């Protein structure tokens, strides 16, 4: 007879080694990558009460982001965006404001920590294989690295694109 401990170990071994299918539900507005190499996208509860109109002193940046997001949602060329500024400058608030404004048009957000950037290709594949007509902005707060950093090379590779890259629904 097999012990419960051995069954538990075998179950954990298989769970760690099997490729888990990741689904994106169109009803979920935001996800966060969690779990490292064997991770998945976990739903985030997002407060949509903050709107772009609540953000003051950054009207030029808001206008550019709104235009870029509209183009992205319409399937037109859109640019990757790198927002810089000190802590509390409103970068995360801009993303929440964009989500509040455009979620009804299919905009969704995927948050990725800097140390998980090497999973961007996996996330790109998930979006590519998802049939829900949503458009996903990948948001990474607190980007800081040097040219030798593996995360930098990964991000640059994804941003530069590949022949099979899913740029129509992932920004």
Residue ranges and their predicted role:
Residues 1-43:
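Interdomain "pre-motor" coupling segment immediately N-terminal to P-loop NTPase/helicase cores
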Residues 40-64:
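Dynamic helix-loop-helix/coil hinge segments at AAA+ ATPase domain boundaries and subdomain interfaces
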Residues 128-129, 146-171:
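Conserved catalytic/switch belt of AAA+ P-loop NTPases
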Residues 56, 141-145, 160:
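Catalytic acidic motif of RecA-like/P-loop NTPases
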Residues 101-148:
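AAA+/P-loop NTPase substrate/partner-engagement loops
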Residues 44-46, 70-78:
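Phosphate-binding P-loop
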Residues 75-97:
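Walker A/P-loop nucleotide-binding motif
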Residues 60-74:
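Pre-Walker A adenine-sensing motif
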């Amino acid at each position: 007879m097999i012990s419960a401990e051995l069954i538990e170990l075998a179950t954990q071994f298989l769970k760690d080694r099997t490729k888990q299918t990741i689904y994106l539900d169109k009803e979920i507005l935001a996800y966060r990558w969690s779990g490292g190499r064997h991770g998945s996208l976990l739903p985030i509860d997002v407060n949509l009460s903050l709107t772009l109109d609540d953000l003051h002193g950054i009207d030029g940046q808001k206008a550019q982001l709104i235009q870029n997001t509209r183009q992205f949602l319409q399937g037109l060329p859109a640019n990757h965006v790198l927002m810089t500024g000190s802590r509390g400058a409103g970068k995360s608030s801009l993303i929440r404001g964009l989500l509040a404004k455009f979620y009804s048009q299919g905009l969704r957000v995927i948050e990725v920590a800097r140390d998980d950037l090497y999973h961007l290709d996996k996330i790109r594949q998930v979006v590519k294989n998802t049939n829900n007509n949503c458009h996903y902005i990948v948001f990474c707060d607190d980007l800081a690295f040097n040219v030798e950093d593996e995360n930098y090379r990964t991000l640059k590779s994804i941003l530069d694109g590949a022949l099979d890259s899913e740029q129509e629904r992932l920004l």
